[in-house]
Amino acid sequence: MVSPATTATMSAWQVRRPGPMDTGPLERVTTRVPRPAPSELLVAVHACGVCRTDLHVTEGDLPVHRERVIPGHEVVGEVIEVGSAVGAAAGGEFDRGDRVGIAWLRHTCGVCKYCRRGSENLCPQSRYTGWDADGGYAEFTTVPAAFAHHLPSGYSDSELAPLLCAGIIGYRSLLRTELPPGGRLGLYGFGGSAHITAQVALAQGAEIHVMTRGARARKLALQLGAASAQDAADRPPVPLDAAILFAPVGDLVLPALEALDRGGILAIAGIHLTDIPDLNYQQHLFQERQIRSVTSNTRADARAFFDFAAQHHIEVTTPEYPLGQADRALGDLSAGRIAGAAVLLI
């Protein structure tokens, strides 16, 4: 694809005014194609996943970091322009025509104690795609080359898009649980991230139990190999060695902790969670049960997950929408009408 002229325009969606989806917070606009900085790539977007974090940004669950931001941080596209300093800035060379991925994390300082010890996801100066900077609900976007991702082969653009956040954050969440080999893992909520994480855990020999509100999601869980699937607040049939809470519902923390066996760990995968009810120490935490949060991801997480995905083909269920229906896609996600991980095609 030829790089667009500096005066070229594109179609995109912006968060006009954060609020519930039925108030029309998204607005479709025609705006200038962004220009890449010397350390950036200009990318023609081919597919962009529709993530629950996009919903949190759009509905105002998260504070506004950029007025009228273009959401979207699970971006797959084609490099059409390479900044003059990219060779020095990137961990690997990028050329025009390369397929590239753009994820949530797009900037860290590189010098703080967190960056130096390999925990760049905790960097106080971190910046995020589709929140601090414009994302992929558009025909074109930019990304710092140092935070662009080479992608595994064997996947379509649509299949790859959810791997860039739903996949990576699920992979990190699974690591945070310290699930023992052959252990029993509970998944609370079964949307885009959980249905990918389940396959990762199954490939590692885990036994999966799913608690989720949607009948279609429960059906998908069983099709993918879960040992059981029940309603969101139901108790699994066996004690769990670990659990991951994907649903942004604080009320589920207590039943998840109660389902843990001694020494079990509950990882909370989301960036936003409603209030957690009062805990009872003896009932919910004693016997060395733990709660752990999960904050973003590192580039090392992404590389490890993509290596895993290249070896174990993940079956990504991707209801597809055209770019012009981004508002409908987010509305369907909000209403629980999506099984799997929705993707916008551009």
From Swiss-Prot:
Residue numbers binding Zn(2+) 1: C51, H73, C165
Domain of life: Bacteria
SUPFAM superfamilies: GroES-like (SSF50129), NAD(P)-binding Rossmann-fold domains (SSF51735)
Cofactor(s) the protein needs: Zn(2+)
One Pfam family, short name: ADH_N
Family matches, as NCBIfam families: adh_fam_2
Name of the protein in question: Probable alcohol dehydrogenase AdhA
Gene coding for it: adhA
